């Protein structure tokens, strides 16, 4: 038997639109934009529910996951959230973390991928405790249930550290039973293009500075060569 630990008192610690199963299960599932949370729980998941926003929604999810050290797998399934691109944002957060100053998820393509309520130690705990299983855009119940059972069979036991409890502000977004309207794909595309333009402007500036230095060096070399040639010519004439 693998080792199990007690979740934080009152787990799940953050309210939300989810279904709770066996708290000793090693599997959690986010169904992203789809309301098929009963499917993973029926197969043995500890908790399952949608996650519609790439900021507060992810923060709430992380708070509930790291407060239960028994959960070692996070299955991303259901339809991707248009505009928010929440599933990809979760993967990017797990792989890359956040910018320490701006708090944006590094590599996320969603419209507003910022993590402000989870400290660095909470993000590191999420990265170490959980393995991400990508079934994004998969809504087939049999496929999801099979993956849940596969993860249960690979249960490595509870994470070595005790439950970590982080308070997340719950006002405004994704309250229980509330639908969060997705950002229009056009808006998300504009946001992404603006970020790309900013990056390209910085690259162009660096390139211009480099070429300016090279040009300055070439001009200096030409002037030295010209002076040397003139001096040599005068000496030969004399």
From Swiss-Prot:
Cellular localisation: Cell membrane
One cellular component (GO) term of this entry: plasma membrane
Segments on the Cytoplasmic side according to the record's topology features: 2-218
EC nos: 7.2.1.4
One GO BP annotation of this record: one-carbon metabolic process
Residues in compartment: Extracellular: 238
GO MF term list: cobalt ion binding; tetrahydromethanopterin S-methyltransferase activity
Keyword line: Cell membrane, Cobalt, Membrane, Methanogenesis, Methyltransferase, One-carbon metabolism, Transferase, Translocase, Transmembrane, Transmembrane helix
Entry membrane topology: Single-pass membrane protein
Segments traversing the membrane: 219-237
Record has Chaperone as a keyword: no
Subunit details: The complex is composed of 8 subunits; MtrA, MtrB, MtrC, MtrD, MtrE, MtrF, MtrG and MtrH.
Protein family membership: Belongs to the MtrA family.
HAMAP family named in the record: MtrA
Functional description taken from the UniProt entry: Part of a complex that catalyzes the formation of methyl-coenzyme M and tetrahydromethanopterin from coenzyme M and methyl-tetrahydromethanopterin. This is an energy-conserving, sodium-ion translocating step.
This protein's name: Tetrahydromethanopterin S-methyltransferase subunit A 1
Organism: Methanothermobacter thermautotrophicus (strain ATCC 29096 / DSM 1053 / JCM 10044 / NBRC 100330 / Delta H) (Methanobacterium thermoautotrophicum)
């Amino acid at each position: 038997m693998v080792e199990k630990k007690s979740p934080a008192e009152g787990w799940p610690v953050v309210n939300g639109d989810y279904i709770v199963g066996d708290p000793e299960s090693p599997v959690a599932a986010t169904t992203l934009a789809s309301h098929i949370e009963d499917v993973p729980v029926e197969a043995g998941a500890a908790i399952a529910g949608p996650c519609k926003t790439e900021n507060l929604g992810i923060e709430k999810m992380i708070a509930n996951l790291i407060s239960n050290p028994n959960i070692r797998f996070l299955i991303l399934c259901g339809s991707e959230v248009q505009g928010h691109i929440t599933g990809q944002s979760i993967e990017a957060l797990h792989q890359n973390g956040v910018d320490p100053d701006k708090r944006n998820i590094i590599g996320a393509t969603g419209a507003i991928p910022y993590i402000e309520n989870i400290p660095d130690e909470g993000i590191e705990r999420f990265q170490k405790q959980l393995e991400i299983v990508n079934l994004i855009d998969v809504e087939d119940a049999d496929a999801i249930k099979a993956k849940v059972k596969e993860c249960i069979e690979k249960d490595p036991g509870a994470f070595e550290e005790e439950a970590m409890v982080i308070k997340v502000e719950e006002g405004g977004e994704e309250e229980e039973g509330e639908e969060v309207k997705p950002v229009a794909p056009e808006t998300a595309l504009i946001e992404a293009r603006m970020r790309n333009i900013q990056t390209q402007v910085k690259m162009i500036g660096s390139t211009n500075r480099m070429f300016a230095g090279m040009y300055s060096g070439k001009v200096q070399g030409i002037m030295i060569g010209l002076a040397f040639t003139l001096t040599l010519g005068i000496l030969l004439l004399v």
